[in-house]
Curated annotation (Swiss-Prot):
Protein name listed in UniProt: Large ribosomal subunit protein eL42
Protein's organism: Candida albicans (strain SC5314 / ATCC MYA-2876) (Yeast)
GO BP term, pick one: translation
Top-rank lineage group of the source organism: Eukaryota
Encoding gene, per UniProt annotation: RPL44
A molecular function (GO) term: structural constituent of ribosome
Gene3D superfamilies linked to this entry: 3.10.450.80
Localization: Cytoplasm
Function: Component of the ribosome, a large ribonucleoprotein complex responsible for the synthesis of proteins in the cell. The small ribosomal subunit (SSU) binds messenger RNAs (mRNAs) and translates the encoded message by selecting cognate aminoacyl-transfer RNA (tRNA) molecules. The large subunit (LSU) contains the ribosomal catalytic site termed the peptidyl transferase center (PTC), which catalyzes the formation of peptide bonds, thereby polymerizing the amino acids delivered by tRNAs into a polypeptide chain.
Amino acid sequence: MVNVPKTRKTYCKGKECRKHTQHKVTQYKAGKASLFAQGKRRYDRKQSGYGGQTKQIFHKKAKTTKKVVLRLECVVCKTKAQLPLKRCKHFELGGDKKQKGQALQF
C-alpha cells in the first residue's frame, strides 16, 4: 500500500521559480485516444469491409500492475511535472497516516 500526501514541497523547473515550492499532487490518467491519429485512421480503413480482424489482438499479458505516475503542479507558477513511482497493487492519495499497532485496511 502506497500512501502519498496531496501536497509536496519539491523543486520547480518553471522559468519563474527554479526553486523548491509547494506542489499539488494528482494521479496521472491517460487521455482519450484520438480518432484522427494516423495509426487509428489506417487501422479503421483496414478493418472496414469484409475480411474479419486484420491485425492480431494481444492476449499474452504479463504484468499485473502499472507504474503509478504523479502529476505535480506548482502552486506559484502552475508548471506541471510528472514523477513515476514504482509498481504497486494499492495506491492511495492523501489517505490517513499510519498509527502504531494498527491493522492494515484496504
